[in-house]
């Protein structure tokens, strides 16, 4: 709905709402005005307003809405205006327009006529008041001339209304009612400060005269020299626009703004103009395509749209056919004539064109209101801009010059530096602020500022010889300056400075603002996934890991050939294919190989100490991938931590994430650089013992976890003792892709143990078996105390630690840790309550013993309390026992059940693989069942791999690729179970708990058990079979070392004997 005077309606609503509403009347009035402005039919709008205002007004809603719409139709909310008498004034003006044949009266006739009409009441009238009267008369004459000229050229009228409208809206937006009161005071009575205001007014009007002189017809005589600035500035033609007069104060540009604010609200032409009507498009649609060119009112605080985004919002019509197409960005037009000697037309003081800056070639002005100006680039040579360069000639009435005059009060942009492109927008009303020193220097030199809305743009071609100033009428794409950035949004003057920051700031994409990628190449050429492991809490730096180029191996002591860590973190500065590719050069990647980044460790610094714990860090960093290791208080720093991921990609995601770590922007995440120092064997041994102690502690705390998790942890920890004996442990890793599934029996090396292991180490792996006898119990263990030091003992495949299972292990471990923590807290609280009750019980008993002469009533009360305490104490003890019993591991499945479940899972996996369905969950389940079956020893003989590795072999004898594989998986029949005697049947459960949690060996209830190796009746396998198994495993290992994902690249670039 159309509202004539929004402010009057708001004040009327505030008065009406004050007695009937508890809310702020002014805020609610604004809300009501916003509701009424909705573009809806009357009935819908009325119902909508009643619905929205019902919350505030309740019972008064319907009456208020009726009054509101009635007032909108009758307009009784408008203030009562005094009877306006200047009705016949337009008729008088029309008569004067008919009578007058010249555009401007001579100044002398005006003075004489004014003296006759208005005789001076005082003889001692000051000269300044006479000058003020003369200038006011001259303004009235100019207004009449302008009204007459309106019919000749409507375009000038639009521009003039645009400027008047802008000055009017700015004065309204600033709300300077003081200037209005001063202007009224000057017209009614004499102000003592009249002379000072008169000087400012005359200065401002003289500048307005020069500003408006470009719209005076050609036949109009130039103004007298008295109109020019009287401070010593030279007299210049009326067509020259002077922006910075010499008598202007040489400080900042605030004096312009203050002066303009104080005077723009008063009537510029000395007569009461009717208020402009509201713009219908702006009220109904929320925007007006004409913007500042619209002759209707847009309110006190109009919405200003940056014209950079305007073409994408409004489809403009194509440019007129008479105009040439816009040149490509950055192209320069030929030099334009300027002032200088020589025959020919030129706007300069010389009689002909010259190389100086000029505007003889004017920019075309768009004919339509909504059409943006065409993009034209004007080269202005390097000599500084003078006043004569801003001359607009009006030789041809059909064209007009670009308004190269910044309106008074605007903030000036910085001076033009050398070799920079300036693009100028014709309709851009937004200006940048100029620094005080540059502004004062400009005013001292007498040079005008750049043209309208100059935007700083770096040169497109820095290699060119000279790039001068360029003014463009199009709205350019904002680029980045090096030195200048204006203020941001100014709420006091949104139409001037609202888009100042957006013009100069470059917006980078997210990928550019992320941290630099510091991940690099290593000497390894194979795309084999790194070793997966469980989370291990460390208090010392981890043992460094290096990867060789030929065979994927985990070296648990520093390698002398290890490259600098910069290669692990950042890409090489040199292209990989530019280096020499010698056959014996193993430290360089192959030709056109993918960059292999292997650094998976991140250092986190400046962590608050209360947040530097495993739980908090795991919550944040587990979002980006599988965490292998978390180490708090890294290197003794309580505010540092070390995070190790499974792959380099996950570490890169974590370090390049823009999310604040633990909602703290001060926490820093860096790549971890390994020290070049090589730890001694002693430090390695200490680290190994510490890890074993940590795992032992964890196993005692989390003994209720599944046994295969416990087994994986110990196996990872026990893979390290080979460093003490100088051995290198080879870790085989075979990634399971979606197209192949592998069912392997656990090899011999998992059951043999290690040379460095002892009986106490092996006792960590005691697990239950399903078989039970009459008075004996069979336990299985993968460790053998009497073992032969062979090559197979040093090979430990990471099937149990592969990437597909480590994620599940981590999740299960995390959940179990949380549950365990809750249980421990509950148990701790119960224990505290139990201790307090026991103390209270002791205190009451001692009281009874001391006070033997106690009254029988008190004694009965104490006895009753003691009885209740005893019941509660026994109840708490039972609860503590049951909680500890619940934490014990549940009974494992029998061999038959486990084998049946394993077969069913394999069958489901085959069906899904044949149908092409997702097999991720089945693979996880199958891997867990494989671990359990290997622990129970129920994997059948000779099953081997159910499918080939990839089926893409090319007949090169590679580990059975594409031929069904040679892995026959021979079962080891050496004893791996214990026969335990010396206990009765009722003690079976306690014995199971004893062997699964405590590690007490043969001691049980003050008795010594008789333990010996269980010898089954099946004959043991021959030595030849053992040697054959070792060979088959080596064959499989050679196949596993080669990645399946990059077979074709290896086939292409691998050196072969028949190619040499």
Curated annotation (Swiss-Prot):
Where in or outside the cell it occurs: the entry states:
Cytoplasm; Nucleus speckle
Its keywords, alphabetically, are: Coiled coil, Cytoplasm, Metal-binding, Methylation, Nucleus, Phosphoprotein, RNA-binding, Zinc, Zinc-finger
Q: Give the Gene3D superfamilies listed for this entry.
A: 3.30.70.330, PWI domain (1.20.1390.10)
Residues annotated as carrying Phosphothreonine in the record are 447
Under the heading SMART domains, the entry gives: RRM
Q: According to the UniProt entry, which residues carry Phosphoserine? A: 927, 1012, 1020
| One Pfam family per UniProt | RRM_1
What sections of the sequence does the record tag as coiled-coil? 809-886
Q: Report the residue ranges that make up the RRM domain in this protein.
A: 600-674
What CDD domains has UniProt attached to this entry?
RRM_RBM27
Spell out the Basic and acidic residues composition-biased ranges.
Answer: 91-102, 124-143, 186-211
Which region ranges are annotated with the description Disordered? 91-143, 162-235, 319-412, 565-592, 940-968, 1006-1060
Could you tell me which residues carry Omega-N-methylarginine? 455
Instruction: Show the ranges annotated as biased composition (Pro residues).
Output: 319-356, 371-384
**Is-annotated flag, keyword Zinc-finger?**
yes
Q: Where is the composition biased (Low complexity)?
A: 579-588
Has keyword Metal-binding?
A: yes
Q: Which PANTHER family match?
A: RNA RECOGNITION RRM/RNP DOMAIN, RNA-BINDING PROTEIN 27
What is the protein's given name? Answer: RNA-binding protein 27
Q: Which organism is it from?
A: Homo sapiens
The taxonomy runs:
Eukaryota, Metazoa, Chordata, Craniata, Vertebrata
Name the gene behind this protein.
RBM27
